[in-house]
Amino acid sequence: LPHLIKSIKAQGYHTAFYYGGEIDFANFRAYFNQGGADKIISKLDFDFSSSNTKWGIHDDIVFDTLFNDLNKETTPFFYTLFTLSSHEPFDIPIEPIFGSENNENSFKSAMHYTDACLGKFIEQAKKTTWWDSTLVVITADHGTTQINNTSNGQKETFHIPLIWLGGALAITDTIISSVSCQLDLAPTLL
């Protein structure tokens, strides 16, 4: 069967998946093994004392690990990181900036934390030798019902970001407003 990881590896890229949680969640292990990922990092690869949330390892630790590993990489790479701190119950290792008295504020605080972790990673990456030849793709696995009390049936809960950035982009500061879905990502990358 076609597989994004197989296609990327065939072009000479080193592939890896980083997730601070249980690797069998959502069948991640099977998916990345089927694709032949060169490296799979999960909560089992971190010191047990770092696992201080229901889901596993907080995003800042996983982003730092990814950044350190990328700095050792000598071949073209296709690395994926799946965050977890922005998922319920929204456990974060910092003071909740929006409070935590209800799910909406807890969600916003968790998103602020994850955004800060991502922002730090991007700012560090911009100072590396590999940034100019790197494409960073940011998207989500699903939307949320935590904001404005939407329900799973409302279209707003299906809106997710798709952001492309990096030194490898020839065109920047472009907004494309046409509708697409996660299924469009692999053919666009290839």
What role is predicted for each listed range?
Residues 1-190:
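Solvent-exposed soluble domains appended to multi-pass membrane proteins
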